[in-house]
Amino acid sequence: MEVLESGEQSVLQWDRKLSELSEPGETEALMYHTHFSELLDEFSQNVLGQLLSDPFLSEKSESMEVEPSPTSPAPLIQAEHSYSLSEEPRTQSPFTHAATSDSFNDEEVESEKWYLSTEFPSATIKTEPITEEQPPGLVPSVTLTITAISTPFEKEESPLDMNAGGDSSCQTLIPKIKLEPHEVDQFLNFSPKEASVDQLHLPPTPPSSHSSDSEGSLSPNPRLHPFSLSQAHSPARAMPRGPSALSTSPLLTAPHKLQGSGPLVLTEEEKRTLVAEGYPIPTKLPLTKSEEKALKKIRRKIKNKISAQESRRKKKEYMDSLEKKVESCSTENLELRKKVEVLENTNRTLLQQLQKLQTLVMGKVSRTCKLAGTQTGTCLMVVVLCFAVAFGSFFQGYGPYPSATKMALPSQHPLSEPYTASVVRSRNLLIYEEHAPLEESSSPASAGELGGWDRGSSLLRASSGLEALPEVDLPHFLISNETSLEKSVLLELQQHLVSSKLEGNETLKVVELERRVNATF
């Protein structure tokens, strides 16, 4: 954007929030309801592509470098190109792009004739979108309000106007323009045959602060326009349109109209921009070099405003999308956190239940092991007892102390004893001399001896304290060479010896005696 002119430099100050502060209803109350496409019927399809050959946008001829006439006043150029300041309520106006590569044709200049009117009535153009979607190649809706204001024209009149006998003062229009951003790419790479004129929608101009631009040329007390369309409502007002909207837009004059000779008809946007910048409005063709330069400059500024507003709109949309993503991510994060908390609580409860089950299982296993060990020990003890009983019955005939008994036998039963008496029912071996024959005639003595034996047996039982056992009839053998008295004494002594021995180990002696008897027979 060109911001320097006549050695003066200024700072661009864009009021980007004006379009977001106003209400759409207030602006619509000030506008007519004539559709924007109805004003474009005067353009034919052959004129749609003529904007690409505009010499005032791309051609840098040597004639442009010539200084303007000294008789013409110095243009009042401001740094800000926001042209929305006026004492009357302002609305949005449409505008468009023009191609940067144009060519100037002298034949078209001579063939075309155009008229110029010095007074322009107040007009308002309003376009409403039909759908909310904006496919690629679309531009936003625009509303244009043009207000006729009487301003002195003598200081801004060019030499061409003076030679043509223009009036000293006339009414000039100061249109106000408001934009809302839309895609810059929608204004480029288009074909006139791709869309019709009925689908035309123009983007609004960016928010502006006109005080910096027209501070020297307009009112000394500028005030901001209180009405502007909200940017939030712009996407809803978007309407599909063809790429031929730029070539048919009234914001820029068609290139073929700037050629030839005759009256010059400029668009309201161009006139408003020229007045806001302090340039005189050309009325006749051909244009002077200064007029061509000024017209080229204001057309370039219109393009720059479009690109700036589009960049802001894209940024706004991008930020809105990011905010929506952040909100969705935040809600999803909260939901996931809640789910994680629920899962953690469930995990804790499951762990507690698992620990309880483990303790129960370990207790049961330990009890089972203890019971199994106890049962095993009991079984082993029973088996050992069974073996002990079995082997005890098998070795009952040998006794627990066979060697000790055998060693004690010689002392218990000396060889000098003629015979041994037993207290149990058994057989006793009587020792006698074979060379002494037995006398069978001594039966009475035998009877007396048997009586003595019986008395000895009863005495033995009484002294030993044993249970009463049936008396055993022992045969008595009489040696022929001994007397009855000697026999009785021997029997008593033997009985006394046996009773004294049995007092120490009664059971052992009885078993031993029985064993000896059994072994003998």
Swiss-Prot record:
Side Lumenal, residues: 400-521
Cellular compartments annotated: Endoplasmic reticulum membrane
Residues bearing carbohydrate: 481, 505, 518
Domain of life per record: Eukaryota
Gene inactivation effect: Mutant mice are born at the expected Mendelian rate, but die by suffocation shortly after birth because of an immature chest cavity. They exhibit severe chondrodysplasia. The cartilage shows a lack of typical columnar structure in the proliferating zone and a decrease in the size of the hypertrophic zone, resulting in a significant reduction of extracellular matrix proteins. Proliferating chondrocytes show abnormally expanded ER, containing aggregated type II collagen and cartilage oligomeric matrix protein (COMP). Displays significant decrease in Sec23a levels.
GO biological process: cartilage development; chondrocyte differentiation; endoplasmic reticulum to Golgi vesicle-mediated transport; positive regulation of DNA-templated transcription; positive regulation of transcription by RNA polymerase II; response to endoplasmic reticulum stress; response to unfolded protein
Family note: Belongs to the bZIP family. ATF subfamily.
Entry protein name: Cyclic AMP-responsive element-binding protein 3-like protein 2
